[in-house]
């Protein structure tokens, strides 16, 4: 029989627990018991495994021992962080009644629910990384997707048209928690993600969503936000907002608007492209040697998060980009002065979110005060910068002198962690609080005077006055003198070597002091809450200030990076094309122990595809990736690693660079490669930048060559995309002779005997050879194997190309031949009976077959 089924047999306390647990059946319940949060039954068993804490038993209820695990209340944030990182959610149940006046169990209620996507506590968040709650919806027309960063109030929605676009959005946003409808069809799209939450269908209803959003924003409709005609996105947004309200158990005043993200506003990059370019995460899953690791020297966490958003959403509006470029140029002479001051601002964005949720701690308000104290100096420095965008940021960040003065008067210089610890409100801020504190703090002087007086009166030199939390104030006399205690001394506690007493005067003073301490703490909590009421009316202006400070941090950082790393300002042109003089890979040049070899690039409508040949390890992939990264950097407004760059409009960046088996989906390397290739061929346009590396590996030589040829042909002739096409199929170097707009380039290398020197220099024309055996020798392949390979190579080169292909590929089954149409000549031969032909008919058939070939 379960605990719920046997409800009436439980103790009153366990009945209270079971009622609360029934309201939150799928998540852990932290049930406050004095100085501990305790978990019972299955929750206790799960928590003991997840947190590696002891599983014990707490007496019995309904005749059965109760499995129990517990954690100290003062260490709860550490344990919550561990659970949230594992995708768990936790309901926090606090005592809200007074134990002294309660009959039966103290009243308790769930005051907040901590989930991976709705955390705002500083201890639970990665400070330089967005923490998103997301919701996904699907109908016959496509997907709806919404994200909310509850730690900043940033609310976005979009309507991805297909599965590939939706997958790219999931990878870009990487939500900590994802809500989906109970009938969601594309489960393979989200399976394996952390923080999945299945929600009932009614939470995604469009009418409910509109009502929820209008209520949140205080509007009659959503036209002003530009989302009125995005029903799928609104369905996701409505579910997401309801979930956020349910978990926070309070209003969300910092969520003031919602923004529609449209494909045409930014350069689109699919999941494979983001992965291959290693923008914020390398191929091994870490953050080292990524584009962000080179560009991100921001001095505030909110600036770092903004920069990463820019990197994942390059904008196409050249007006925005030119404004950023101009600002970066104007700030280059001021970075050394601005960055130390900006560093002192801290993470104002997340502090404001905690203020809005009324969970800001005393040190949050102290940090907010410190941020306000930097604003006058920042504004004074920016006044000297000759840039309209900088002056606009200066105005937007404001000064908040009144709020700074309020916090300077209200909060002590170094407050404790929690308001319940007391001593947060500064002396002089409130007269009544000062009076209660004086009464409580005067206890030390009183006790010293009492001790001197009683020693003199009794003549007992071992007499002393003290206090402990259990027994309160006492007079202590050694065991040897205890028989001399006056008659008015009432025994309170017996120790091994002493007796402790109380007298009416001391008891009366104890009551007075404890009352004053309690009243002081209660008043302090009230004054602290009133500070929220004084600050919250300024929330919108404060959020604008935080946004301006974060943007300033990003732009100052990019100015510093441009100067330090010798970057140049790219020029935007109207027609498709990319012209780079002495371009460099932004990441590789930082990790090399030798100078990076800069290379040029020229793509235009008249030269829209480069066939790139050269040895493995020669630098083909680096050359291709650096082109994409330079384009990406240009389209966030950054300066770029080159001597000169001219770049035209780009709508998408595609990369088909390297692949690995997708074992989880049952897809081979070749299948992954072909899926990514298909996506490119279906979605690329003449404004797209396409990187194709070694297409056609993983199948027979002829199949691979045929596929690579056809893909290159399609990209150059039909799609007309700007394409870098690296290959080891030397037959493809004939394409420039057969098609307009195609050119050969190669990565140079020098071979001397058994050694090879990679020049990493891009030259016009095709490579003379692939240097495969030299690279194999460099990799440590045994010499006898290299020797045998050279012998076999000479054999293959001495026979006809067809024979060579037969020897190499004879045992391989051609994928393309399976569905090839039979030629007319073959069909004619299959229907021919040679035994029935006359010599003349046989001759006629020879001529007929020749005409069919």
UniProtKB/Swiss-Prot annotation:
GO terms for molecular function: ATP binding; ATP-dependent DNA damage sensor activity; damaged DNA binding; mismatched DNA binding. GO terms for cellular component: cytosol. This protein is involved in the repair of mismatches in DNA. It is possible that it carries out the mismatch recognition step. This protein has a weak ATPase activity. ATP binds at residues 614-621. PANTHER family: DNA MISMATCH REPAIR PROTEIN MSH1, MITOCHONDRIAL (PTHR11361:SF34), DNA MISMATCH REPAIR PROTEIN MUTS FAMILY MEMBER (PTHR11361). Keywords: ATP-binding, DNA damage, DNA repair, DNA-binding, Nucleotide-binding. Belongs to the DNA mismatch repair MutS family. One of its GO terms (biological process) is mismatch repair. It comes from the Bacteria. The keyword Transferase does not apply. It comes from Escherichia coli O7:K1 (strain IAI39 / ExPEC). This is DNA mismatch repair protein MutS.
């Amino acid at each position: 029989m379960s605990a719920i089924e046997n409800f009436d047999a439980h103790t009153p306390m366990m009945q209270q627990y079971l009622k609360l647990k029934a309201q939150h059946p799928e998540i852990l319940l932290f049930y406050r018991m004095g100085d501990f949060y305790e978990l019972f039954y299955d929750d206790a068993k799960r928590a003991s495994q997840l947190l590696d804490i002891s599983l014990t038993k707490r007496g019995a209820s309904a005749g059965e021992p109760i499995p129990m695990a517990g954690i100290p209340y003062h260490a709860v944030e550490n344990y919550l962080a561990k659970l949230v990182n594992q995708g768990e959610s936790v309901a926090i149940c606090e005592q809200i009644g007074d134990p002294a006046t309660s009959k039966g169990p103290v009243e308790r209620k769930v005051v907040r629910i901590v989930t991976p996507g709705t955390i705002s506590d500083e201890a639970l968040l990665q400070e330089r990384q967005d923490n998103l709650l997301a919701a996904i919806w699907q109908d016959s027309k496509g997907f709806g997707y919404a994200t909310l960063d509850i730690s900043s109030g940033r609310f976005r929605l979009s309507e991805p048209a297909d599965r590939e676009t939706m997958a790219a959005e999931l990878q870009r946003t990487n939500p900590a928690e994802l809500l989906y409808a109970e009938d969601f069809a594309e489960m393979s799209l989200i399976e394996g993600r952390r923080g999945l939450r299945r929600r009932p269908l009614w939470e995604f209803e469009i009418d409910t969503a509109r009502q929820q959003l209008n209520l949140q924003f205080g509007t009659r409709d959503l036209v002003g936000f530009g989302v009125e005609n995005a029903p799928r996105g609104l369905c996701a947004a409505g579910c997401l907002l309801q979930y956020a309200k349910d978990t926070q158990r309070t209003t969300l005043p910092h969520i003031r608007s919602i923004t529609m993200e449209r494909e045409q506003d930014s350069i689109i990059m699919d999941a494979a492209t983001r992965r291959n370019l290693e923008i914020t995460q390398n191929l091994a899953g870490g953050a080292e040697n990524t584009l962000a690791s080179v560009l991100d020297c921001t001095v505030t966490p909110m600036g770092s998060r903004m920069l990463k958003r820019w990197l994942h959403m390059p904008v196409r509006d050249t007006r925005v980009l030119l404004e950023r470029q101009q600002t970066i140029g104007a700030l280059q002479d001021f970075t050394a002065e601005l960055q130390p001051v900006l560093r002192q601002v801290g993470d104002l964005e997340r502090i404001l979110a905690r203020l809005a949720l009324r969970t800001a701690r005393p040190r949050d308000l102290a940090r907010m005060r410190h941020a306000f104290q930097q604003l006058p100096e920042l504004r004074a420095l920016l006044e000297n910068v000759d840039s309209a965008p900088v002056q606009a940021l200066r105005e937007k960040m404001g000064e908040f002198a009144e709020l700074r003065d309020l916090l300077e008067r209200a909060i002590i210089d170094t407050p404790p962690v929690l308001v319940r610890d007391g001593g947060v409100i500064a002396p002089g801020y409130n007269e009544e609080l000062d009076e209660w504190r004086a009464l409580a703090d005067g206890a030390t002087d009183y006790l010293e005077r009492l001790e001197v007086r009683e020693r003199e009166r009794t003549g007992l030199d071992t007499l002393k006055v003290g206090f402990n939390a259990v027994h309160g104030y006492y007079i202590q006399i050694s065991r040897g003198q205890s028989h001399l205690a006056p008659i008015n001394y009432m025994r309170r506690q017996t120790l091994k070597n002493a007796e402790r007493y109380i007298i009416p005067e001391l008891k009366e003073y104890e009551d007075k002091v404890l009352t004053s301490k309690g009243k002081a703490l209660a008043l302090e909590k009230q004054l602290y809450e009133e500070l929220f009421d004084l600050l919250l009316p300024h929330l919108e202006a404060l959020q604008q200030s935080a946004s301006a400070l974060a943007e300033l941090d990003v732009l100052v950082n990019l100015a510093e990076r441009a100067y330090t790393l010798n970057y140049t300002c790219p020029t935007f042109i109207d027609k498709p094309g990319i012209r780079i003089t002495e371009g460099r890979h932004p990441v590789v040049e930082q990790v090399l122990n030798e100078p990076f070899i800069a290379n040029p690039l020229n793509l235009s409508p008249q030269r829209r595809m480069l066939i790139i040949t050269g040895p493995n390890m020669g630098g083909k992939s680096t050359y291709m990736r650096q082109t994409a990264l330079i384009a990406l950097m240009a389209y966030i407004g950054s300066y770029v690693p080159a001597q000169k760059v001219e770049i035209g409009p780009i709508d998408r960046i595609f990369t088909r660079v390297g692949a690995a088996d997708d074992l989880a989906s049952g897809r081979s390397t070749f299948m992954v490669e072909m899926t990514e290739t298909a996506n490119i061929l279906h979605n690329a346009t003449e404004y797209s930048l396409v990187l194709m590396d070694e297409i056609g590996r993983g199948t027979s030589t002829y199949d691979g060559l045929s596929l690579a040829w056809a893909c290159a042909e399609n990209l150059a002739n039909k799609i007309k995309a700007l394409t870098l096409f690296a290959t080891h199929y030397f037959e493809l170097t004939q394409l420039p002779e057969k098609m307009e707009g195609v050119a050969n380039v190669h990565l140079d290398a020098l071979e001397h005997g058994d050694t090879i020197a990679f020049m990493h220099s891009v030259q016009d024309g095709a490579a003379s050879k692939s240097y495969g055996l030299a690279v194999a020798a460099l990799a440590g392949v045994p010499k006898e194997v290299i020797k045998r390979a050279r012998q076999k190579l000479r054999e293959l080169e001495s026979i006809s190309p067809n024979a060579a292909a037969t020897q190499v590929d004879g045992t391989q089954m051609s994928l393309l031949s399976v569905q090839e149409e039979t030629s007319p000549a073959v069909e004619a031969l299959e229907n021919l009976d040679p035994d029935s032909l006359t010599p003349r008919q046989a001759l006629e058939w020879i001529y007929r077959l020749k005409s069919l070939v």
